[in-house]
Amino acid sequence: MGCYSMGFVGRKAGMSRVFLEDGCSIPVTLIEATANRVVQIKTSDVDGYDAVQVTVGSRRSVLVNKPESGHFAKAKVEAGRGLWEFRVEKTQLGSYSVGSEVGLSIFAVGQKVDIQGITKGKGFQGTIKRHNFRMGDATHGNSLSHRAPGSLGQRQTPGRVFPGKKMSGHMGAVKQSVQNLEVIKIDVERCLIAVRGAIPGASGGDVLIRSASKI
């Protein structure tokens, strides 16, 4: 079994830059990090695994269905904009209780973190943009196949297109993680955390922050 640790749900606020003591300017992503509220504690005895379920933000009551409303009411927690789970070690479960809050204190400046988000959706795209295919000649007798993908396979044998063939299709809007980003600054008063570099998704998208799994 792998080593699990508590994570945090934030919202991408945008990008900026920070000047270091030596005068160097580095790009950072600002993440809005309001307190996460614990909704449920899952244990291996009851649920088959150990995890902490959290929510964040708020949602209008008309947008919360009956099962969710009952789930939040049982925990005596305000309905948030979603539910997320973080696997933790069994020995860590005692540090959390239903209704308590998880703050930025679980991270420190200089720490390496992994961040997961949903990439920007690009809609239906061709093979050149989606898979970095090479374009055909612009001239020299080519008048039909400037951006065509080319051959999709062979003839009667095998008589089919192999699964996984790179073709046109929907691009983006998938779950993606970036690893080993350094925490540059934590602003507890303004509920912001700045990490070095870029993270997946558009501004306003929810992201999951965890301690780096590979260092």
Curated annotation (Swiss-Prot):
InterPro entries assigned to the protein according to its UniProt record, in alphabetical order: Ribosomal_uL3, Ribosomal_uL3_bac/org-type, Ribosomal_uL3_CS, Transl_B-barrel_sf
Keyword annotations of the record: Methylation, Ribonucleoprotein, Ribosomal protein, RNA-binding, rRNA-binding
Residue numbers bearing the N5-methylglutamine modification: 156
Post-translational modification: Methylated by PrmB.
One annotated Gene Ontology cellular component of this protein: cytosolic large ribosomal subunit
GO MF entries: rRNA binding; structural constituent of ribosome
Database matches in SUPFAM superfamilies: Translation proteins (SSF50447)
Family: Belongs to the universal ribosomal protein uL3 family.
Function noted in UniProt: One of the primary rRNA binding proteins, it binds directly near the 3'-end of the 23S rRNA, where it nucleates assembly of the 50S subunit.
Protein name stated in the entry: Large ribosomal subunit protein uL3
Organism: Xylella fastidiosa (strain Temecula1 / ATCC 700964)
Lineage: Bacteria, Pseudomonadati, Pseudomonadota, Gammaproteobacteria, Lysobacterales
